[in-house]
Structures are given as C-alpha cells and as structure tokens.
Amino acid sequence: MLTELEKALNSIIDVYHKYSLIKGNFHAVYRDDLKKLLETECPQYIRKKGADVWFKELDINTDGAVNFQEFLILVIKMGVAAHKKSHEESHKE
C-alpha cells in the first residue's frame, strides 16, 4: 500500500506525463503544452507570471522544453506558496 507522499509523487509524475505525452515525449513539455499545464493544473499560481515567463524560468538548459527535473522547480515553488497560504488562512480563523 502506498503512503500519502508516495501517492502525491505518483500524481505529480502523472500530471507531467499527461502534458509531455501530448507531443509523444516522456521527457519534455514544450512551451505551448506548459501553458496548457499551467492554466489547467495550477491557475492560481500563474496569476503573477505568464506562461512565457514560467517557461524561461524553468527551461534551465535552454533546450526548448521543460524536462521533469525542471518541472520539479515549478512543483517546489507551488508547494512553498501553498504552504504559506495555508498558514495565512489558519491565522484568519
């Protein structure tokens, strides 16, 4: 039986593959597909930055695609923001 963390990790991998496989590559999410991913999977976290800004920030090796390791940067930043928001909401109560 998987732990909650293992389930969450599998979910992250599944989301990445959902968008990487649009163009048939397990290892690359391209600019237009990253935009779809951001708009669909994490709309509240892209308000301040557009998809093009995110793409430039995430495509560290400048190969024109976001690989899984680069994608994890987005996941970490979203996680930090969600954690911060959870504390802000708990202080409002």
Swiss-Prot record:
The source organism is Homo sapiens (Human)
Function description: S100A8 is a calcium- and zinc-binding protein which plays a prominent role in the regulation of inflammatory processes and immune response. It can induce neutrophil chemotaxis and adhesion. Predominantly found as calprotectin (S100A8/A9) which has a wide plethora of intra- and extracellular functions. The intracellular functions include: facilitating leukocyte arachidonic acid trafficking and metabolism, modulation of the tubulin-dependent cytoskeleton during migration of phagocytes and activation of the neutrophilic NADPH-oxidase.
**Pfam families on file:** S_100
**Additional information:** Binds two calcium ions per molecule with an affinity similar to that of the S100 proteins.
Cross-referenced Gene3D superfamilies, in alphabetical order? EF-hand (1.10.238.10)
Give the modified residues of type S-nitrosocysteine: C42
Write down what this protein is called: Protein S100-A8
**GO CC terms in record:** calprotectin complex; collagen-containing extracellular matrix; cytoplasm; cytoskeleton; cytosol; extracellular exosome; extracellular region; extracellular space
| Residues engaged in binding Ca(2+) 2 | D59, N61, D63, E70
Q: Keywords for this entry?
A: Antimicrobial, Apoptosis, Autophagy, Calcium, Cell membrane, Chemotaxis, Cytoplasm, Cytoskeleton, Immunity, Inflammatory response, Innate immunity, Membrane, Metal-binding, Repeat, S-nitrosylation, Secreted, Zinc
**What's the protein's topology in the membrane?**
Peripheral membrane protein
Query: Any one Gene Ontology biological process term?
Result: positive regulation of peptide secretion
Q: Give induction info.
A: (Microbial infection) Expression is highly induced in CD14(+) monocytes, neutrophils, and developing neutrophils of patients infected by SARS-COV-2.
